[in-house]
Amino acid sequence: MGNMRRLLIFAVLVILTVISNSKSSYKYDGSLFSSKELDYDETDTKAMGSVFSRYMSDSDAQLILDLDFFRHFFNYAEAYRDGAEEGNLELMKYAVEMVEKLKSFDISMACVGDMMHLAWTGVEYATHVEEHKNCSDCKCTPLFQQKKSERHWIFNVFDAMGKVPAGIMSGNNLWVGSWSTCRKIDVVKNAQGQKWKGQYCLATIDAYERDNPLVYFGNMMSGPPDKHCYDKTVKNVTDDGFCFALFPVLKFGVCMPNTCTNHDVKQMLSFAIRATEGAVGTKSVCNVDVECRAESYSDAMSENGLAMFALYLLIATVVLVTFGTLYDLFIVSKAPQDEKNSSAFNHPFIKFILAFSMYTNGSEILQSKKNDREINSLHGVRFLSMCWIILGHTYYYIGTSLTTDNLVPTLINFPKQFHTQIIVQAPLAVDSFFFLSGMLAAFSFFKKTMKADPNHPPKLSAFNWQTWPMYYYKRYIRITPTYIIVMLFDVTLFTYISNGPFWRPIERQGCSIAWWTNLIYLNNFLLQDQECCMGWTWYLANDMQFHIFLMPLLVIVFLKWGMKVGLGLSTGLIALSSLIRLIITQIYGYPPAPILTAKLQIVYQLNDYWNDVYVRPYIRCTPFIVGIVVAYLLNAWTTREQKDLKIKLERRTVIICWCTSTVLGLYSVFGLYWFAKTGDISKPWEILYTIFGTPAYALALGWVVFACTTGNGGPVDTILSWRLFVPLSKITFCAYLLHPIMLQIYNLSRPQPFHFTTFIQMIRYTVEAVFASYTIAFFFSLAFEKPLNKIDEMLFNSKKMMNGENGNTTEMVPLNKIRNSD
């Protein structure tokens, strides 16, 4: 591993050699470059290799960890910059010669010409410095300063490039340089007024799989830090030509002229790397990817038709919201009550305009009145679970964005701390929303059937053939429009919202291929081998599938055959789900849960674990089923005449249930601590957690909600039923859709790498993320979610949509009862 990284240092040196400030006695002549692209000459590799062979012979460094190596390396690299400043014509001449070698590569003539202009400007700068040394007349000083100022931009090119940063020993592979310095370079290069403009390019260099650093990371904290570089007991995998793709061995920023394409820069880097590998006699770099970011007309938002459509949609929405709010405040609210009930105010166009009123929509969201016949504790469960998810995603997106300069030691030490199991097990929070989803929808069904007046048949019937198709339709139509708008903004407007060395379009590539799988809620099955679109929405796919298959099955069984059969079927489905999970994890050697351990090799498994286990509905269905069971029990154990849902239980029963629930909850969250800390787990404990980990959490949460709803929750109910959670709960669906986008924008917009420090640091970032996500979700709900729901009610109200030809009606479950959010 040390040798591999050392080679990358050499590659950087070659790049700096080629493009640093230079000098030559030659005159710069653009006619030297023909449009014909020549084949690569291997003699260039040998020539360049000899340069570095001489350098290596002068260095005592054998490892990347040797600081003397870096001192020699940067002294050598800085010599080119100093050569221009000190007027070293011989060194500048050598730089021009090296640039001329680029003519032999598959590089565009415009790029080579600008590279030569850079080198020749260095020659001119050095020449003026040399001339000024021999000038005794003070009158030549102003002229020298003018010429020096005109050519001083070449040092910005050098300064903008990546340098070896601090933290090399802790795996800092982000040598990003200065994006802003490079982008500011804009100088006239000839009499025709053509310009030399800087563009920032980030090179990603991948190692071979045989040099997989994860082989060493598990034990790198013991013994000398370089022991694995010479330890003969460490056996590399066969050189099968595969690249180590989990993360790059180096990300290196270079400043290039904007005439160079990604391909051009890749060719120059490949030349440098091949030269370095030729010098040491081994191949260490498997692949080089380059992404250059230059402002071009074709990249402008005005040239993106879909982005312009999204922009016009946003503008139109702002206009509608403004007009609807003003009309509501100054016309409707001041009109007498009898006029409000008139046909004029009930005209479809007026209703359409008022659907966008921030005043009315905001009042509805902020309304925090509680109802004794509702499950008030679910508001707190929903919001706190969303905070838990944001906490986990804060860590996840910082880590997976590969913008952290101390990622390796953080990943090694993170799972060893007991309190961090709360973050490691954050995926359990998703189970909270599966539970809420099943419980709320089932509760509404059971309430309207089991608590119906005997003298008046219930409007809602689980056995009516119209009920379930319309239930599916209403669920789809209430969720999908908001989902589509978030997706549209994500792949268009959010692409242009920021910039920087790490910035990239967040979901454009994945959504351009897989968007349709999201709209049919099968993105947890289809195109799993490709980049997904809004990967966090796998939850919506699972949730929709649960409502299509499990909801009618269990509701009908409970209503037709009663509690015993319903509980028996529910238990059987949960046992079958756990058994399937156990079989898959044992066959493929997956961990019992998607957690990080001290042995980082587990990262290899988590990607396949995602596809085979994490997003599969037949494995994630347990909390949804438990939610339906709790909903049935709440309705079965209360009477229609009750004004609330209180159930009197014996004190001993309540204490036993709370103790059991606490044990189950702690087991589900902290039960794999030793596995996370050491990377080792006994087979019995692994099987036990695989089978009971998820059901334990679902049962614990089920008791908490049941106890709080029936009056046995005590202070827990007081906290979860806090009125402040009510409005926050209402916008959690939008917060769920938007918060990963906010986190990615934040992580990818930084000009410099992120540095992990303490747990408190991440708590602060999480609080900021929660605040930002819910603030944006509030306005997004005002502008899109609430208006779309009201328009849906206008177009497809229950009487028009549900009346059959025989006059029977089926009342749909209200939106706030069927939709929940992750």
UniProtKB/Swiss-Prot annotation:
The keyword ATP-binding does not apply. The chain crosses the membrane at residues 306-326, 617-637, 655-675. Glycans are attached at residue 236. InterPro entries: Acyl_transf_3_dom (IPR002656), Nose-resist-to-fluoxetine_N (IPR006621), O2_lipid_transport_reg (IPR052728). Residues 1-24 form the signal peptide. It is found in: Membrane. It is a multi-pass membrane protein. Keywords: Developmental protein, Glycoprotein, Lipid transport, Lipid-binding, Membrane, Signal, Transmembrane, Transmembrane helix, Transport. In L1 larvae through to adult, hyp3 and hyp5, the most anterior cells in the hypodermis, and in intestine. Other hypodermal cells show weaker expression. Disruption phenotype: Increased resistance to fluoxetine-induced nose muscle contraction. Slow development, embryonic lethality and defective yolk transport to the oocytes leading to accumulation of yolk granules in the pseudocoelomic fluid and appearance of pale eggs. Reduced level of sensitivity to dihomo-gamma-linolenic acid-induced sterility. GO terms for cellular component: membrane. GO terms for biological process: lipid transport. GO terms for molecular function: acyltransferase activity, transferring groups other than amino-acyl groups; lipid binding. Coiled coil: none annotated. It comes from the Eukaryota. Belongs to the acyltransferase 3 family. Plays a role in the uptake of a range of molecules including lipids and xenobiotic compounds from the intestine to surrounding tissues. Mediates transport of lipids from intestine to the reproductive tract. Required for efficient yolk transport into oocytes. Vital for embryonic development. This is Nose resistant to fluoxetine protein 6. The gene is nrf-6.
